[in-house]
Every structure is written in structure tokens, then in C-alpha cells.
Amino acid sequence: MAEQQISNLLSMFDASHASQKLEITVQMMDTYHYRETPPDSSSSEGGSLSRYDERRVSLPLSHNAASPDIVSQLCFSTAMSSELNHRWKSQRLKVADSPYNYILTLPSKGIRGAFIDSLNVWLEVPEDETSVIKEVIGMLHNSSLIIDDFQDNSPLRRGKPSTHTVFGPAQAINTATYVIVKAIEKIQDIVGHDALADVTGTITTIFQGQAMDLWWTANAIVPSIQEYLLMVNDKTGALFRLSLELLALNSEASISDSALESLSSAVSLLGQYFQIRDDYMNLIDNKYTDQKGFCEDLDEGKYSLTLIHALQTDSSDLLTNILSMRRVQGKLTAQQKMLVLEVMKTNGSLDWTSKLLGMLHTRVVAEIESLEVSTKRDNHALRALVERLKLET
């Protein structure tokens, strides 16, 4: 490989008019075998260069050949000034971080930070570790938003241009992936090696849940309500559970395994409530229209729980026909979306979803009450957060 590099370099110069020679040091990155015995080898069979060994090579240069400085820039010298190296690292860090820093400037409700603080009432994790957990969950959440917006072709995020429409899809996805890797690196600082496999398994579950959601959309497959809930438990619930998992691994509280299991169930239930509520609000809330666009989920082809119920109860197949036009047109018109909402209302799907959310909210509150009894500690912070998410009727 190194000999081929040298050969390629030689072709850049006019050897026929060479009048001087330049000696450079080639630093080898991989072991390769000489065709001839190296000077310091006693073997007649040929030797080898070990990793990072050096070999001095004479290169003929013409009168008009590039200067030695140019040659050194062609990766034949690993020497680099500390100033140049610092500038390069600073620039690459700025470029890699820019899309992520952009999404951090967008308005946020701070739900996940408040959620972690509320769980910590019971788990008593030290402040330093709690800060890392908040940062990690924020990194995973925001990087997933960057990816989601690109996958869904969403032009807006929280009322501002989506990250991929500002930096381009390639740069946005590269940064999102980069941030996920950085998050996992930070997780390694606060959990032991034995627990790391379980933690990364939870992160993997998030992507698997998202994969199912995307697959249904791409192939126009209408999932059952049970399948939808399983997907939500993976896609959204897993990130909520990851918060609990990281807190539990760093907890200084005396909390029983049964209490942790009950807390995990409550957290999964809250994750389901959160996703169903978010999808429902996308259909009926004017604030969501300002932030994301009018019924944007319908443009994306996403199967929300409300839409699944409406399709199951639509004997006229009107919804099926309208949704098929999205695949033809690329998106639905405002009038088509209004017709979808009309069918949902007529079929009782909007009311059904609203009632279901009310029941889920009641169950979450009941789980909190049960945990307060078992832990002998009230959790006003978690109660306040759940009340904040309560659907206004």
C-alpha cells in the first residue's frame, strides 16, 4: 500500500528533468513486506516493517516540482503544528455540533428534565450523576427529533425550520448519529460495564420501535390497536424507561425491587399516554398547527391511534381512499385533511381517543398513589407533571 502511494506521488513530478533529490520519512501505518531485504535485516528472504516503523526514500524532483512543504502536506509526514491541529479540531467540532446546537435553541417544554427530577424524589441520585442523566436523555431525545423530522419530511419543529432544512439532510443525520454516540460515551461514565449492555439494549429498542412506525407508513400497513401500543411502548416508552434505568443504577435510596417494578410500569404507562396525547393534539390543537403545521401527521402518513380507530370503524372506505391520495400527491390538501377530521368526528374516533386518554391519566395517577404508599413518600413533583399533561376537556 505504501509503495503504491509513493508511486502515485512520483507520477506528479517530471522525473526526466530531475536535478535534485529529496529525502522524506515515510511513516508506515500497517505491516507490509519488502520485496528486497531491508538494510537492517539479516534475512535473505525479505523482511517486514512493523507498525509505525520508518523507511527513508529518495524522490527525484524536477526544477519546477512542488516544494518539500507540499510533499509534507500529502500525509507523508505526521508532524503537525499544535496551532494547526488546534484550529482543525476546533473547526470540526463546530461543524459537527452546529445542527445539534441549533435544535437546542428551539423552544422546549422541559418535560423530560422535570420528569427526571420528579423520579429523583424517590431515587435520590447525587446531583452530578443527575446532571449527566439529564444531558444524556436530552441528547438522545433531540437527536431523535432531528432524525424524525427528516424521516417525516417535516418542515417545522416547534414553529421554526426543521434542522435538516437548515443544514441539509446529510449534515443533520450525521450530527444526530454523532450525538447518539457521544451520549453512549457519557453513559459509560455513570454505569458499570455489566449494566451497559442493558442500557444500550433499551436504546436499541427505541430505534426498533421507530422502525415499525416507519415500516407501517412506507408500506401503508394499518396496525392493530394492540400493535400500535406495543410500538409506542418501544419508541416512546423506552426513552422514559431509560431515564428511570439510569437513575436506578445511580440511586442512593433504599427502594425495593417490587417498588422499582411498579415504577417501571407507571413510567411505561406515562410514555404511552404521552405519545397518544401528542398524536391526538396534532389533530385537534391549533397550537400544534402553529408549531408543526395543520394535521401534519396526516401528511406524513403516520398511523395514530385515532386514525387506526377511524379506519376500523369506517364502513364506507372513504378514509382509505383519501389516504391513498397522499401517496399519489405526496401530501394531503387542507380540504382533504378537513374531510378526514370530519370522518373521525362522525365515527366517534376523536371522542373515543379523548375518553381513552382520560382513563390512562386516571391509571397513571393511581400508580403514583400506590408508589407513594409503598415508598412512604409523597411525590408532588410527579403529580404536578402528570396534571400538567392532563388533556383539557
From Swiss-Prot:
Residues binding Mg(2+) 3: 278
InterPro entries: Isoprenoid_synthase_dom_sf, Polyprenyl_synt, Polyprenyl_synt_CS
Residues that hold isopentenyl diphosphate according to the record: 109, 112, 141, 158
Entry's cofactor comment: Binds 3 Mg(2+) ions per subunit.
Induction line: Expression is induced under gibberellin-producing conditions.
Pfam families hit by this protein: polyprenyl_synt
Amino-acid positions noted as binding Mg(2+) 2 in the UniProt annotation, renumbered to this chain: 148, 152
Cofactor entry: Mg(2+)
Entry keyword annotation includes S-adenosyl-L-methionine: no
Disulfide bond sites: none
Catalysed reactions, semicolon-separated: isopentenyl diphosphate + dimethylallyl diphosphate = (2E)-geranyl diphosphate + diphosphate; isopentenyl diphosphate + (2E)-geranyl diphosphate = (2E,6E)-farnesyl diphosphate + diphosphate; isopentenyl diphosphate + (2E,6E)-farnesyl diphosphate = (2E,6E,10E)-geranylgeranyl diphosphate + diphosphate
Biological role stated in the UniProt entry: Geranylgeranyl pyrophosphate synthase; part of the gene cluster that mediates the biosynthesis of gibberellins (GAs), diterpenoids that may provide a selective advantage during infection of the preferred host plant, rice. Gibberellins (GAs) are diterpenoids and are synthesized via the mevalonate pathway. Biosynthesis of the major metabolite GA3 (gibberellic acid) from geranylgeranyl diphosphate (GGPP) requires 13 steps.
Protein's name in the database: Geranylgeranyl pyrophosphate synthase 2
Organism expressing this protein natively: Gibberella fujikuroi (strain CBS 195.34 / IMI 58289 / NRRL A-6831) (Bakanae and foot rot disease fungus)
Family, as annotated: Belongs to the FPP/GGPP synthase family.
GO process terms (BP): alcohol biosynthetic process; gibberellin biosynthetic process; mycotoxin biosynthetic process
Listed Gene3D superfamilies: Farnesyl Diphosphate Synthase (1.10.600.10)
Gene Ontology MF terms: (2E,6E)-farnesyl diphosphate synthase activity; dimethylallyltranstransferase activity; geranylgeranyl diphosphate synthase activity; metal ion binding
